[in-house]
Amino acid sequence: MASLGKVVLTLADIAAQLGGDVLGDSQTPISRVAPLATAGEGDITFLANPKFRSQLSACKASAVILRPDVAEEFPGPRIVTGNPYAYYARVATLLNPYQSGLSGVHASAVVESPVPDSVAIAPNVYIGKDVTLGENVVINAGCVIGDGVSIGAGTVLYANVTVYYGCSIGQQCIIHSGAVIGSDGFGFAPEGQSWIKIPQIGRVVIGNDVEIGANTTIDRGALEDTVIGDGCKLDNLVHIGHNCKIGNNSVLAGCTGVAGSTVFGEHCVVGGAGMISGHLNIAAGTTISGGTTVMKSILNPGVYTSVFPLDTHEEWLRNASHIRRLSKLAERVSELEKKLKEKDIEG
C-alpha cells in the first residue's frame, strides 16, 4: 500500500539540497514539519505571514524557516530564505517521500502491453493494448488504462483511476483516486424533439508535473484534444469539459466547473466552486474568486469576483428585491436627470 516514508535530516543536509542560509547549529536533526504554534523538538516550522511573527518568541521548534528581514527574531537554529512557504513545501517533500509499497506486476493484474521492469502495478489493474508506460510509473489497485494510452516516467495513479483509450499523461504527474480521464464530452446535436450523440474523437493530453484531484473528470475532445498544460494543479471534484485548454501552471480549486471549448492562458487561478461558461477565453494571469460565475471572456488579467456578499437571510432578501428592480430604477433616474437638465436650460 502507498504511504509516505519518514526521513531524518540535519539542517545542513536540507540546505545542501534546497539552498538557503543556515544560522545556528547546522547539525540540528529534523524529522517533521509542523505549524508554528505547535512545533516542538525535532520539528521544523516556518513563518510566511508577518502577522504571526509574535509567535516566534514562544516557538519551541528545533528550527524555523524565515525571511532575511526577520531572521534575528528567532534565537534558535534557522534557515533563511526569500520564500519560506515554498521552502517549507520542499522540506516537507524531503522528509515525507512517496513510497508505493509496490514492486513488479501483481498476479491479478491484466496487462496486455509490454511494460518496463521498473513499473509497479497493483492488484486488479487492467492495462489495454498498445499502452506505453515510462520508467517508474506506479499504478495502484483497480485502475483501468485503455488501449493506446501513454503515461510518462515517474507518474503515479492512485486507486481506481480510469484513463480512456488514446489519452496521454506526461511525466511526474499525480492522479488521485476516482479520477476519470477521457470520458466522452457532452456533445449532442438537436433533431426535432430528440438528441443525436456526437462521437467524441479527440483525446485528453495532460502535460508534465500535473496533479489531478480525487473524482475529478476531464472530458475528451469532440474533434480537437482537451489539453491540461504543464504544472497545472486541479483539486478534487473539478470538471473540465471537452476541447478546453488549461494553460501551464494554472490552479483550479475544488468543485470548479469549466464548460467545453474554454481556453485559459498560463498562470490562472480559480477559487473553489468557480463556474466558467463554454467557448470563452481567459487571459493569462487571471484570478477568479471562489463561487464566481464567468459568462463572458476575460481579456485583461486581474482579480474577478461575482459573488453576492454574505448577509443575514432577511437582508439578503431585501437586497435581492432591490436588484430585481434595478432596470426600472435606472429608467427613473434617467428621467429625473433629463428633467433636471430641462429645468437648467429653462432657468
Swiss-Prot record:
Major enzyme class: transferase
Pathway: Bacterial outer membrane biogenesis; LPS lipid A biosynthesis
InterPro entries: Hexapep, Hexapep_transf_CS, LpxD, Trimer_LpxA-like_sf, UDP_GlcNAc_AcTrfase_non-rep
Any one cellular-component term (Gene Ontology): membrane
Gene Ontology molecular function, alphabetical: N-acyltransferase activity
SUPFAM superfamilies: Trimeric LpxA-like enzymes
Keyword tags: Acyltransferase, Lipid A biosynthesis, Lipid biosynthesis, Lipid metabolism, Repeat, Transferase
EC number(s) stated in the UniProt entry for this protein: 2.3.1.191
Any one biological process term the GO annotation gives: lipid A biosynthetic process
Catalytic activity: a UDP-3-O-[(3R)-3-hydroxyacyl]-alpha-D-glucosamine + a (3R)-hydroxyacyl-[ACP] = a UDP-2-N,3-O-bis[(3R)-3-hydroxyacyl]-alpha-D-glucosamine + holo-[ACP] + H(+)
Catalytic residue list: 242
Family named by the database record: Belongs to the transferase hexapeptide repeat family. LpxD subfamily.
Binding partners and assembly: Homotrimer.
Role played: Catalyzes the N-acylation of UDP-3-O-acylglucosamine using 3-hydroxyacyl-ACP as the acyl donor. Is involved in the biosynthesis of lipid A, a phosphorylated glycolipid that anchors the lipopolysaccharide to the outer membrane of the cell.
Protein name: UDP-3-O-acylglucosamine N-acyltransferase
Organism of derivation: Dechloromonas aromatica (strain RCB)
